[in-house]
Amino acid sequence: VEIAAAKKWLALGGFAGREHDSFGSLSYGEQRAVLILRAAVKCPAILILDEPCHGLDDEYRQKILDLLETIAESGTTTLLHVTHDPSEVLPCEKHILELHPGEKPMYKIITSGK
């Protein structure tokens, strides 16, 4: 991975100038953001996220959701975002599969985007 690309993603995640901070010195929410950024910097075709906001306070929950939206809007990565909290569905997510125990899955295609 190019250093310039890594610095770009760190800046997008609010970590400009903190490239040399140790992982252990970061808060739990910051660690979660860095793990997502570490995956995003490689520009994968698909980024699979299982409960990326689980256990976070409201402030870092919103920061993570904003970060995920930035990644999705980059146009290079498709997010597969698994959550139990419907309020975490991002405005940019266009395909939603809703699962309920014992019921047929409900699939929605959102055509309007934001």
Across the structure, where does each feature detected by a protein language model lie?
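H-loop/switch region of ABC-family ATPase nucleotide-binding domains
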Residues: 82-84
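Hydrophobic anchor residue at the start of the ABC signature
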Residues: 36
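Conserved catalytic motifs of ABC-family nucleotide-binding domains
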Residues: 43
